[in-house]
Amino acid sequence: MKKYMIKITLALAAVFALAACGGSREPGDAAGARVLRNLFQRSGVPANIVSFKKTQGREAHIGTQDVYEYWYESEIQFPDGYEAKCAEEKERGPCALLGIAEDQTFQKNEILKSEGSLHFSKTGKGWAAEDKNDY
């Protein structure tokens, strides 16, 4: 009887462990930094991410879509300087990614401490990000 109980306990533990691993995990620091880096490259922003940290996140359901809102803090370095033209920005672009609202000039190697947000949509492969990749 004792061996039977041990087998059942082990089987239940395995089922619970597999169930816990089955769901797609929320995006973490590495995914967020990669998305931000890809968006900078796509927007032509010559920047390096010095540090990146997720500060908050939450799942939501909008219409028929499961989404994940992701807030972060980062330090961004501009190796060759950068001229941010925020007044001309009509859509979510470089200035939104940098967390700034007004035109700003960054000197060579200047570091900007910024806060921002990223958005993900749940797919069969995980979480699709704004850079069109799954994480």
Name every feature range the model reports, one short phrase each.
Residues M1-A19:
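Sec-dependent bacterial lipoprotein signal peptides
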Residues C21-Y135:
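Cystatin/cathelin-like cysteine-protease inhibitor module
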